[in-house]
Design a protein with these regions (language model features):
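Secondary-structure boundary/capping micro-motif
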Residues: 1-296
């Protein structure tokens, strides 16, 4: 008998802006499923959310493993299949989460493609935590700014023959779930956006290696595109940065940077990355919707 595998889980295990009676910050575990996106850009399927508070004195991989076991059991009681993968976006918690996942049949995927979790966390920061006793109102000390690594060139075998800027109206992206593609990862479209708003992206072309390139990129967990100076950079995983193109003309780089900045404001940060055999080929070997969110 084949055991079904459920959607990936997204996990955050971290302190919250709430002081407990002992003067220590409250820790909390949040888990939710990565939503499946239908042909209209809407999330669907069995959704699972689970939360537990954790005393600061109990923050360790043992507590986390026991909590994960509870979450798996509760998901099973709801008729939901267990996931195979856990996505975790906090680099500082990676080792602890990995230790907790060992022995539970869960694979840790260091990734910032945790859009559902980030949205839930933002909602809790606005609506839930301020109502809790001990909530620390006002500005908190900001976390240390992440150290951005120098972009690394793509391996020779993963480079396309050419690439091009692209743009699609938001309404077209709602149909991405029905497009023919070998590798694909979509994200829910934020509500309330103008259907005609342009969403910027990049198309990579290779007549002989499009499928291989798409497969390689799929393992990177692509997050967002960035124009840094005269370089086009793909951010992926937790902190990886891959150089897609360099030595862009100054005017071209400036215009592209403005377009991507406008997308963050107008299109909820949405972007896309596509891999095709050629510009005239309708099929996508790879298609990823990305979303540029502020760094946590």
């Amino acid at each position: 008998m084949t055991t079904s595998i459920g959607p990936d889980w997204e996990l955050d295990y971290y302190s919250r802006p709430i002081l407990e009676p002992d003067g220590k910050k409250r820790w909390e575990l949040l888990i939710c499923t990565t939503p499946e996106v239908d042909s209209q850009g809407e999330s669907h399927g069995g959704s699972f959310r689970w939360s537990r508070t954790c005393p600061a004195s109990s923050v360790n991989s043992i507590w986390l493993r026991e909590a994960l076991q509870e979450a798996l059991a509760e998901a099973g009681q709801q008729g939901l299949a267990a996931p195979r993968r856990l996505r975790c976006w906090r680099a500082s918690m990676r080792t602890m989460v990995q230790r907790a996942a060992e022995g539970l049949g869960l694979e840790l995927v260091p990734s910032r493609r945790t859009y559902a979790l980030v949205s839930w966390l933002q909602q809790r920061e606005q609506e839930v935590y301020p109502e809790q006793e001990g909530y620390m109102a006002g500005p908190l000390a900001p976390p240390p700014a992440p150290i951005r690594s120098v972009p690394v060139p793509l391996p020779e075998a993963a480079r396309g023959d050419q690439w091009a800027w692209a743009s699609l109206p938001l309404d077209a992206l709602r149909e991405a779930g029905g497009w023919e593609s070998s590798f694909r990862s979509l994200v829910p479209i934020p509500p309330g956006l103008d259907p005609a708003v342009p969403v910027p992206g990049i198309r990579l072309f290779s007549r002989s290696r499009a499928l291989a390139i798409a497969g390689w990129l799929a393992g990177l967990e692509p997050v967002r595109l960035e124009i840094s100076g005269n370089q086009l950079v793909l951010e992926a995983g937790l902190e990886d940065r891959w150089l897609l193109a360099s030595a862009l003309p100054e005017a071209e780089a400036s215009a592209a940077a403005e377009a991507f900045a406008a997308a963050r404001e107008q299109a909820g940060g949405l972007q896309f990355l596509a891999v095709q055999a050629s510009e005239s080929e309708p099929r996508f070997e790879g298609f990823w919707m990305l979303r540029d969110l502020p760094d946590a």
